[in-house]
């Protein structure tokens, strides 16, 4: 008879969790940021609000975003006028969209990740699904299991309403699952669709308007597992993780699910709160490794907006190229909430290989991934690149 201790030992993986594949997807509808203010004020019947439109134009100009992808197009919005109003009861219409579309977009990203991984989907043991777009039972994790044809015994974990830090959360959870379940292969999917937060403009809540200038739709998927087989090709090791709530940050970023959809609230000092506390998080993460030069590591930071990135750079004295992959994703896709950091991870390994930089992390060994979001919550993931 085996002992509990022997069972426990047999469950543990030998080595650290690794990211083995990454896939991303966006809806087909692409919006150009330079023409978006005209479109947005026209489609929401708000063209009479000329001063507010000028403000919104300035927000879009300063956003450092070139384009975004959105499930909501003109046709869908014309069929759902309640979604275009600032505060009209519209939750049912929004739910009908996202309950269908969030798993579908997730499937597109997951299919790409599974293809790159190169193993049969029957080898997936765990599924983590994360979205801030809609809530339903059974959840998007169940819908995706059906859409992909995963085994009914796959162990599912559904994360709703986490917000922009959750790209870090899913990696932290996937690491714990992979390292504590020998042979586990975890499919992680973040799928975000702004149909829950889209609404017309108002001059009483400019933070709502900031969201309309920044948010985009996208889904990203990764396969995480320890002890890779010879046929599996790890991209990054997940070395260490942490989550913390920043001091004096209550109410800095809030979202509330109401009859009018998901409302978004933002305090102006979010970039200040993050930049003030970022060094503490880095010291905790990198002191054990003997690293104190933060220009010597590669960077993946959730691009909440350009002001956050600017202030973090200034506070730490980072060279402009450190945030290159992060700024590229912000520019090409906008803020896709939880999916962003996984898009950046994908961008980084692709550019590193294209440019012949020697490792998946821009030629460097060590890196950091940060998620920032409601709370204010900060997720920190220490990554180790692999040689290419």
Curated annotation (Swiss-Prot):
GO terms for biological process: flavonoid biosynthetic process; polyketide biosynthetic process. InterPro entries: Chalcone/stilbene_synt_C, Chalcone/stilbene_synt_N, Chalcone/stilbene_synthase_AS, Polyketide_synthase_type-III, Thiolase-like. Its EC number is 2.3.1.74. Transmembrane segments: none annotated. The active site is at residue 164. The keyword Transferase applies. Pathway: Secondary metabolite biosynthesis; flavonoid biosynthesis. Keywords: Acyltransferase, Flavonoid biosynthesis, Transferase. It catalyses: (E)-4-coumaroyl-CoA + 3 malonyl-CoA + 3 H(+) = 2',4,4',6'-tetrahydroxychalcone + 3 CO2 + 4 CoA. The keyword Transferase applies. It comes from the Eukaryota. GO terms for molecular function: acyltransferase activity, transferring groups other than amino-acyl groups; naringenin-chalcone synthase activity. Belongs to the thiolase-like superfamily. Chalcone/stilbene synthases family. PANTHER family: CHALCONE SYNTHASE 3 (PTHR11877:SF100), HYDROXYMETHYLGLUTARYL-COA SYNTHASE (PTHR11877). The primary product of this enzyme is 4,2',4',6'-tetrahydroxychalcone (also termed naringenin-chalcone or chalcone) which can under specific conditions spontaneously isomerize into naringenin. This is Chalcone synthase 5. The lineage of its organism: Eukaryota, Viridiplantae, Streptophyta, Embryophyta, Tracheophyta. The gene is CHS5.
